[in-house]
From Swiss-Prot:
SMART domains: Ribosomal_L14. Belongs to the universal ribosomal protein uL14 family. Keywords: Ribonucleoprotein, Ribosomal protein, RNA-binding, rRNA-binding. InterPro entries: Ribosomal_uL14, Ribosomal_uL14_bac-type, Ribosomal_uL14_CS, Ribosomal_uL14_sf. HAMAP family: Ribosomal_uL14. GO terms for molecular function: large ribosomal subunit rRNA binding; structural constituent of ribosome. This is Large ribosomal subunit protein uL14. Binds to 23S rRNA. Forms part of two intersubunit bridges in the 70S ribosome. GO terms for cellular component: cytosolic large ribosomal subunit. The lineage of its organism: Bacteria, Pseudomonadati, Thermodesulfobacteriota, Desulfovibrionia, Desulfovibrionales. Part of the 50S ribosomal subunit. Forms a cluster with proteins L3 and L19. In the 70S ribosome, L14 and L19 interact and together make contacts with the 16S rRNA in bridges B5 and B8.
Length: 122
């Protein structure tokens, strides 16, 4: 459950390390985002000489949340951290590698590129 001002780890090799959510997309009154949702983020920490730099405003898709997500079979899944993958204007991942596991819900939301790059899909 991600809202405005939430900080997220970045789960790709785009060069950003931490980002802060500045808007949840999907309606004017939408407050929370969960796995598979797109948010607008600002880069708070970044490595030097990389694709993104501190202060960049980008879109990102949430791949892990600490708040559990209920699945249709009744099971729940939750992770140890809140993490996102940065997206470019076309909705494709900026990085070429994904670190850590991602949730299976991304497959249903057509983020197949992220699912194929991820080392583990839970």
């Amino acid at each position: 459950m991600i809202q405005v001002e939430s900080t997220l780890q970045v789960a790709d090799n785009s060069g950003a390390k931490k980002v802060a959510c500045i808007k949840v997309l999907g309606g004017s009154k939408r407050r929370y985002a969960t796995v598979g949702d797109i948010v607008v983020v600002s880069v708070k920490e970044a490595l030097p000489h990389c694709k993104v730099k501190k202060g960049d405003v980008m879109q990102a898709v949430i791949v892990r949340t600490r708040k559990e997500v209920r699945r249709v079979d009744g099971s729940y899944i939750k992770f140890d951290s809140n993490a996102a993958v940065l997206l470019n204007k076309q909705g494709e991942p900026v990085g070429t590698r994904i670190f850590g596991p991602v949730a299976r819900e991304l497959r249903g939301k057509n983020f197949m590129k992220i699912v194929s790059l991820a080392p583990e899909v839970l």
